[in-house]
Structure formats: structure tokens, C-alpha cells
Amino acid sequence: MGRASLQPVLTGFALTTRVHIVGAGLSGLSCAVHLAESGHRVALYEAAGQAGGRCRSYFDAQLGATIDNGNHLLFSANHAALEYLRMIGAGDSLIGPARARFPFFDLRSGAHWIVEPGAGRIPWWILSKARRIPGTGIGDYLAGLRLAWAGPDARVGDCLNAGDPLWERFWEPLTVAALNTAPREASARLLWRVLRDSFGQGEAACRPLIARDGLASSLVDPALAYLEAQGAEIHFNHRLRGLGFSGDRAARLDFGGPDVDLEPGDMLVVALPPAGAVAALPGLEGPQDTRPIVNAHIKLPRPPLDTALKARLGLDATLPILGLTGGTAQWLFIRGTMVSLTVSA
């Protein structure tokens, strides 16, 4: 969703070029916002009846509440996402702690601890036994440097020892949360990039942030309002079935109804998930292996934790999130009387 990913798209665009963007998930919305800001005319098409893709909110009649379809969390190091929020006027819609801290609870043993990075790039905090995860030593953390020299095909499990205490209590939760892939299958290089850009920059870069009033209120609705104010065309219930070509140029968008003709000079951006892109674009190959994330939302008659227990577990008052080990779910999100559990990979 970042500006960097848009640079190849923006390169070579003539000012006021009309750009057709297929897909109104966050990639498509971000692309549309940046192009509209640059003065281009934007037409946005979405297969569903609402924007946001996998990042949206909806009203659940059984719970009697508006919930998010997933428990999405941003790191403060995600400058591209924060810039996107600023552009659409939602820069103040995220909440998070004043300092980065991640409380964990082990469901098997009842042990609990807090991962609290230091301020600088060098992790001096691992020298303090009181700040290390229970049962771990300095060498367990330094072993993570092996990820920096991992080959292109190396997996996290190739670089780190699954028998080390840090595996279950840090490496596995981090890998699953960041890559939605088990460590034995996840790319070591990709995990190193996550570490380098977050924990490797000090605590100010890895403060967790969530949408205060829901994903739609922060990431989707303000973007649609911004695009409408810029004169963008927004079309819902438009599923791209294929492209019509004139020579080697895309000339028509087939939506199974009235087609949309692309004029000479128009540009096309396909911002679809792999399955949708492969179905619409001839000759395109995409990944077939996917891993869903399951979220369970439970409404309780009263808040589940009292003030004393929150303090004991180290939960932040503004962002009560608890990492879980030793069970099926990896994360517990608490918002008043609403509890959400996340099961990844």
C-alpha cells in the first residue's frame, strides 16, 4: 500500500492522463489517491459492493455491532501507510501506545512476559535478564543475525533452531504475524527485512497501531470521500472478466455488461489479488498456494479483564492486545466487551 510500490505506475504518465484502476482494495485505493493527487483523472472499478477488499468493516447482526473482517495492525515504521492516511485526512484515526511493547501469555504454562525493544538500533535490552523473554539467553537473540545472510531460497527454519526457547516465544509469533506463514516455510530474507525495518530501527519504529473506530473509518471511507472530491469515477459491482486487445494494447474492459473502452493515451492498473488477476489477464501466472486467516469475534456481557489483571499482564490501556503461545490462536484483541481472536497460517 506504499508510495514506493506506485513509482513504476506513475513513471511516464502524462499530466491529466485518464487512469482506469481495477480493484478497490487498499492497493487500488492507494494507487487512485496518489494518482488523483497528481492531477490524473481516475476511474475505479470494484467487483464487490464496497471498497476495502480484505480490509473492511461490516455490521454483524448477531453481535449487534460493527466489526472488522480482520484484526489488522500497523507498525509505526510503515511510513507509506501513514502518508496515505494523511493524504485522505485520516492521519489521526489510529491509536497505539506511547512506546512499543508486546505482552505475551503462554496458554500451557501460564507464563507471561513483555517484549519491549530499546530506543536505539542496537538491542542493548537483551543484555538485561529482566527484559529478556523467560528462559532465553543473549545468544538466542544473536542467532537471529543468521537471517541477514540467508540465501534466496532459505526458510526461517533453516536459519533458526526450533528447539531454542526463543523459537516458540518470539520467532514463530513474529513470522506468522508478519508473513502469515509458518517459520519452516517462510522466507528468511523476507523476515529479515521485517526485522531490519522495525525492531532494527528501535522502538519508535515498531509501535503497534490499530484503527480507532474500525478499518473502514480509517482506511476506506476517507479515501472514497477524497476521490469523489477529486472527481474520480467509482464503480462498484464491476467484476473484470477479461480484456479486449487491439494489437498488444489493452483496448477494452469486459465487465460482463456494458464494456468500457480505453481511449488512446488511457492507462490501466490491475490491482487485484492473484486469483483475480490470473483470471482476467491472459498468460499471467500467479501463486496458487494461499493461507487464510481466521478471526473469531465474541461479545461478552462485561469486559473480560479488570484493571489489576491488565496491569499484571502488561496490557496497554489504549491498545489491549495480547500475544498468545501454546494454543491455536496467536493474538487476542480486546475492545470493551468485544474480544477477537486471530488464527493465522
What is the predicted role of each segment?
Residues V194-G257:
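Helical element adjacent to the flavin cofactor pocket in flavoenzyme catalytic cores
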Residues G2, S38, H238-A345:
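Mid-domain catalytic core of redox enzymes
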Residues S27, Q50, A275:
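Conserved Rossmann-like nucleotide-cofactor binding loop
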Residues G52-A77, G137, A143-A148, D197:
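Glycine-rich active-site loop/strand segments that organize a redox cofactor
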